[in-house]
From Swiss-Prot:
A motif (HXTX 1) lies at residues 34-37. Signal peptide: none annotated. The keyword Hydrolase applies. Belongs to the 2H phosphoesterase superfamily. YjcG family. It comes from the Bacteria. It is an enzyme of class 3 (hydrolase). A motif (HXTX 2) lies at residues 115-118. This is Putative phosphoesterase SH1944. Its EC number is 3.1.-.-. The keyword Membrane does not apply. Disulfide bonds: none annotated.
Length: 169
């Protein structure tokens, strides 16, 4: 089973991000707007309950996190991916660090860059055109997220689904 952890914003916040994703993101139908906290990792089906218990344990005393998407940015030249950059707060960094350790299914492959992807799967020309447009429009989305979501990849439907949520209280 392929699972991961993410912060998923409210429907209204998702609608704002999806306004761009519908047009520019080849993965739009596979996953909702999110901030990845723990990238996908593989477990056996019988390990799911212990993973859930470990997530609960690690989140003890951890409160809601403020999310502020401040501008369009990109991973170019590494990838032609455009995203809304989220201000990296101590709380977001701490949350990421709680779950990206050897004793919880391994270290992160990449440094933590909190963001909402809005465009991917682009040619270089598409990237240049779209990035210029999105950068001019700007973004200022704020929200307090009060739960961490556990997602599972559904191979039959070729999409990620929330299978559990954990209160940040």
């Amino acid at each position: 089973m392929n699972i991961g952890l993410a912060l998923i914003p409210s429907k209204s916040f998702q609608d704002e991000v999806n306004g761009y994703r519908k047009r520019y993101d080849t993965e739009y139908a596979r996953i909702m707007p999110h901030i990845t906290i723990k990238s996908h990792f593989e477990i056996n089906d019988d390990e799911l309950d212990s993973v859930k218990e470990e997530v609960k344990k690690r989140l003890e005393g951890f409160g809601p996190v403020d999310v502020h998407a401040t501008k369009a940015s990109s991973f170019k030249p590494t990838n032609n991916v455009i995203y809304f950059k989220v201000a990296k707060t101590d709380e977001l960094e701490q949350l990421f660090n709680l779950f990206n350790t050897e004793d919880f299914h391994g270290e992160a492959e990449h440094p933590f860059v909190p963001h909402f992807t809005i465009a991917q799967g682009l040619t270089s020309q598409e990237f240049e055109d779209i990035f210029g447009q999105v950068e001019l429009v700007g973004v200022d989305l704020k929200e307090k997220i009060e739960e961490l979501s556990l997602l599972r990849y559904d191979e039959e439907e070729d999409k990620w689904k929330v299978i559990d949520t954990f209160k940040l209280a």
